[in-house]
Amino acid sequence: MSDEQIKLVIVTGMSGAGKTVAIQSFEDLGYFTIDNMPPTLVPKFLELAAQSGDTSKIAMVVDMRSRLFFREINSILDSLEINDNINFKILFLDATDTELVSRYKETRRSHPLAADGRVLDGISLERELLAPLKSMSQNVVDTSELTPRQLRKVISKEFSNQDSQSSFRIEVMSFGFKYGIPLDADLVFDVRFLPNPYYKPELRDKTGLDTEVYDYVMSFDESDDFYDHLLALIKPILPGYQNEGKSVLTVAIGCTGGQHRSTAFAHRLSEDLKADWTVNESHRDKNKRKETVNRS
């Protein structure tokens, strides 16, 4: 059993107030997330999580979809209060009746408490039943005027144990066009216009991470010119992607085989961006040619 205290966030609130967006936001922040958790299973789940020691941050949606919600939630919260291994908070999402009705009309879904089909009646009953839980919540967020992106920013600011910049990650990868463009790439750049080290016998079996290849690739004026333009393009747009709520931006740089030119450029870009951002560097096809030769 781990001695580390489990950080638990119970996401609840009005139906239609944004709990789906919220739980996705917690997943982006590195939380283990569970949607529609029956209250009776919460203690057992937390016990297993503590025993495994693998999960230190958990966010779970507990709401009206569980029929025993109101009967069980108070006793569950009482048990959490006296558990020294659990540090829990309640995030209560709310919105005005007008906004909730509008959202239900837009999605054409029925309210879980609207027995006769009238959405407003269901909202009124739910608001009355949830009032005690709302009063116990440490975090109450009114989402009436928030876009999904804005709600994600609110949650990130409140519940991330890192600064907002480090919760946004940049994946810089090299690849070979002959093996296909990466499906998850957001930005793709082509460096096949540069001289190819493959045609230098002494460089053919090396990669862009080797000093000899890197220096060769970067020795040309067009390499420096292109890189300067590349960096000048990417740096100003990163805050925009971050502000839009994107958690990972994948920048892919390709050459013919992904072994020499693209690898050198991806490495250089990664090193320069690491001064200000969280960056992960990878080289998808760096060893593809060597593997192919060995199999033949």
Curated annotation (Swiss-Prot):
What SUPFAM superfamilies does UniProt report for this protein, alphabetically? Answer: P-loop containing nucleoside triphosphate hydrolases
Positions with a binding annotation for ATP: G13, M14, S15, G16, A17, G18, K19, T20
Asked whether the UniProt record includes Nucleotide-binding among its keywords, one would answer yes
What InterPro entries does the database record attribute to this sequence?
A: P-loop_NTPase, RapZ-like, RapZ-like_N, RapZ_C
Enumerate the GO terms in the molecular function aspect: ATP binding; GTP binding
* Protein keywords: ATP-binding, GTP-binding, Nucleotide-binding
Instruction: Give the source's domain of life in one word.
Output: Bacteria
List of residues binding GTP = D63, M64, R65, S66
List, alphabetically, the Pfam families matched: PapZ_C (PF22740), RapZ-like_N (PF03668)
Physiological role: Displays ATPase and GTPase activities.
Belongs to which family? Answer: Belongs to the RapZ-like family.
* Protein name, as recorded: Nucleotide-binding protein SAG0531
Q: Which organism is it from?
A: Streptococcus agalactiae serotype V (strain ATCC BAA-611 / 2603 V/R)
